[in-house]
A protein has these predicted regions:
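NTP-binding/hydrolysis catalytic cores, primarily Walker-type P-loop NTPases
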Residues: 247-296
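G-domain G4 guanine-recognition motif of GTPases
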Residues: 40, 173-174, 196-211, 233-240, ...
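Extreme N-terminal, non-catalytic leader segments
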Residues: 1-44, 55, 62, 96-100
Length: 296
């Protein structure tokens, strides 16, 4: 276990903007890049991707903030090997500013931990969400990258954070249930004017990941009018399971493992693509998501 330390970050004393401030204005207040990792279903590796992506972004000296957006039952601190003295509940309860909850994670990244077992924080009311987004925007200005690990599902708090972020990364696996839930999440984001970037996890081959992404994009394009672009595939890799069991991110514990290499490639793409755009595909049907993927 690492000994967590509070990170001294100056807090702006400017008056808070009114609750009517919209998400677009909050997003413009962020100087660095912001990524939200979202999934429609739990158990697809979302938190693991968020943690390891944050660490991959930090490899070249970037200042990275990792936010556990599952405020009621997150696990970012566990995967980082931390036992923080404070978490986001202290801020939401008014005990300290948002920066006062930060701990130092692996490679010096800043980690904003969530609470554990606080059911009252699973969904924040509108004024609290507005306050959080404003303060998170202020805090994010001090970092080159902010990576937010969102709760699974389609709650209002998670959706607000997904809309706030510049780049929503939608994670799924080839599992039919995961694909169906990912499609539902993409549909909600599309209704709010956002097209996520797709990452397919736990693929047996690169061809399998590409085929899953093609079918997903075809279905989304036909029904939603916007197709998520495939931004990466992550292989099924025992190194990821071993690292999780040891509470050690795999990009640190197994830097040469195939999954670590792919996460670094994803981080590189995020850093070099100024304005990533989704791609258009021919029309399709939702049932196309569940057709078997041919063997490579």
């Amino acid at each position: 276990m690492r000994d967590p330390r509070t990170i001294p970050i100056p807090i702006s004393t400017a008056p808070r903007r009114p609750e009517s401030t919209r998400l677009g204005e909050a997003r413009q207040a962020v100087a660095g890049r912001t990524v939200a990792v979202v999934s429609g279903k739990g158990g697809v590796g979302k938190t693991s991707l968020a943690v390891n992506l944050a660490l991959a972004l930090a490899e070249n000296g970037a200042r990275v903030l990792l936010v556990d957006g599952d405020f009621a039952l997150g696990s970012v601190d566990v995967l980082c090997g931390l036992a923080p003295h404070r978490n986001v509940s202290a801020y939401l309860d008014g005990a300290c500013p948002l920066a006062g909850t930060l701990a130092v994670g692996p490679r010096g990244i800043a980690v904003l931990p969530s609470a554990s077992g606080r059911s009252d924080l699973s969904e924040l009311d509108s004024p609290t969400r507005t306050r959080l987004l404003e303060d998170l925007g202020t805090l994010s200005r001090r970092f080159d990258w902010t990576v937010v690990d969102l709760p699974s599902g389609i709650g209002s708090t998670g959706m607000a954070l997904a809309r706030w972020a510049e780049i929503p990364l939608l994670l799924t696996t080839p599992d039919p249930a995961a694909l169906l839930h990912a499609y539902a999440t993409a549909k909600l984001l599309a209704a709010r004017g956002r097209t996520p970037r797709l990452v397919v996890n736990r693929v047996r081959t690169e061809a399998e990941g590409a085929e899953v992404a093609r079918r997903f994009a075809r279905t989304a394009s036909f029904h939603l009018g916007a197709a998520p672009e495939l931004w990466g595939t992550l292989p099924e890799d025992p190194a990821a399971q071993r690292a999780a069991a040891d509470q050690d991110p795999f990009v640190v514990a197994a830097p040469r493992a195939p999954v670590s290499v792919r996460v670094r490639e994803l981080a590189h793409r995020l850093g070099t693509d100024e304005h990533p755009q989704g791609s258009a595909h021919a029309g399709g049907d939702r049932k196309d998501l569940f057709l078997p993927v041919p063997a490579a």
